[in-house]
Regions:
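Active-site beta-loop-alpha junctions enriched in small/polar residues
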Residues: 1-2, 32-34, 60-64, 100-103
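N-terminal binding-site loop/beta-alpha segment at the start of enzyme catalytic domains
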Residues: 1-55, 121
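P-loop/Walker A phosphate-binding loop and immediately adjacent motor/lid segment at beta-alpha junctions
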Residues: 52, 61-64, 116
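Glycine/proline-rich, positively charged
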Residues: 66-121
């Protein structure tokens, strides 16, 4: 499901869809910071208000967010910033599964994995 300008543009309807899914027993929600430039995460966060503990919440980072070349990739700096931004948009203090949307050819995999390990701490 996509929410925001890339998908369902009706925010209230998007929240109803998520609520119906949760009521039907779905307990895994996956989104990404790049989906609708963060709007999908914001809508998911609103929908999960009061129900966060009932859901395994996943999101992703890597893809460009805007034209700034520093707002993308697998560098430690970007991963930490992207995680903080996702937490804020999702209105939560933890993400159950934080995923790399795709590997970065510009960043050593050890840097990416090190940043992800530090986020767990």
């Amino acid at each position: 499901m996509m929410f925001g300008p890339w998908g369902n543009k009706d925010e209230a309807d998007s929240i109803r869809v998520i609520h119906r899914a949760l009521d039907a027993g779905i307990n895994f929600v996956d989104t990404a910071d790049v989906y609708s430039a963060g709007e999908s995460e914001r809508i998911v966060g609103q929908a999960l208000a009061g129900r966060r503990d009932d859901v395994v919440l996943a999101t992703k980072f890597f893809m460009p967010l805007g034209t700034d070349p520093n707002n993308r990739g697998g560098s430690r700096r970007w991963i930490i910033r992207a995680a903080e931004n996702s937490l804020r948009r999702l209105d939560t203090d933890y993400i159950d599964l934080y995923q790399v949307h795709r590997p970065s050819q510009d960043t050593d995999v050890e840097e990416t994995l090190g940043a992800l390990t530090d986020l767990v701490r």
